[in-house]
Amino acid sequence: MFNILIVEDDSFKSKSLSDFINLHMSNINIEIATNLQCAITKVNNSLFDLILIDMAIPSHPIHSGTGSPINLLNGGLQVILELQYLKRSDNCIVLTQYPDIEICGEYFPVKNASINIKELL
């Protein structure tokens, strides 16, 4: 079984990704995390062969009495940092609709982001 985690808060995008993966792969298990809190929980509880990570995700789900989620433009980076903290080597692909990714208060072009993320780790 090939385990995939999709970290994406937009249900249309996560369904599109799931549909594409299901069309091209078999014997897979896909889990969805729609916010940072859920993604961190899933990463701590399971191993994944591949993680697709949207960089801009909300901090937590919307529930009555929990306060409004904060939209974290680099929330996906927190997932990668959690994997590093856990000494994990799950394969990750970063997804974003923005031309730049914020890393430690600086913006880097998406095409260079993997280098900058590795330097951070």
Model-identified regions with their sequence ranges:
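Receiver (REC) domain switch-region micro-motif
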Residues: 51-53, 83
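The short loop immediately C-terminal to the conserved phospho-acceptor aspartate in CheY-like receiver
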Residues: 56-61, 70
